[in-house]
Amino acid sequence: LNVDGRGELLGEFKPNDRLLVINQTGKLKTIIPELTTHFDEDMIVLEKWNPKKPISTIYYDGEKERYFVKRFLVENENKEELFITEHEKSQLEIVSTDWRPVAEIVFTKVKGVQKENQTIDLEQFIAVKGIKAIGNQLTTDKLKQVNLLDSLPFEEPVEKVPEEIEVIGEESISEDIKTELDDDGQITLSLE
């Protein structure tokens, strides 16, 4: 991290903003950005964290010997968590922090027959679940490769925060208190 304008811009940060860090080992954490922070060599995602934005992944479960898809939100921002199974042969294939990611799966040729590649809209394939969920099985077929394609378009909803509340008209709150609008449209209270 630096403030010299070198490297990739991660955005502007407020005091409570955090960075999302995901490693190739299937571990993630969020951290408060500091200039002295150093990152592991196997880091594959480093971006400003949006707590409402799901993380999508396809991983190989070493115990079940199958590929799984899962989508989840970071549940504990103060703790590093493993989001793939703990088996020694489990491995992360792809991870995306896009809202609507799309993946292509390339099948292994079986007995000289090549099955056609398949495109998967991960948002449609599985709902957002907990980080500890195994996920949905991707396929029973053997895979040669998993590729992350361009994500589908998505516009993040913008929260509108009202700056001023305008009260129109005159209303009596109680018999003892009377409200009126003055010349500037401001409410005046008077006790009777």
Q: Which residues are covered by each model-predicted region?
A:
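C-terminal interaction appendages of subunits in large macromolecular complexes
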Residues: 1-192
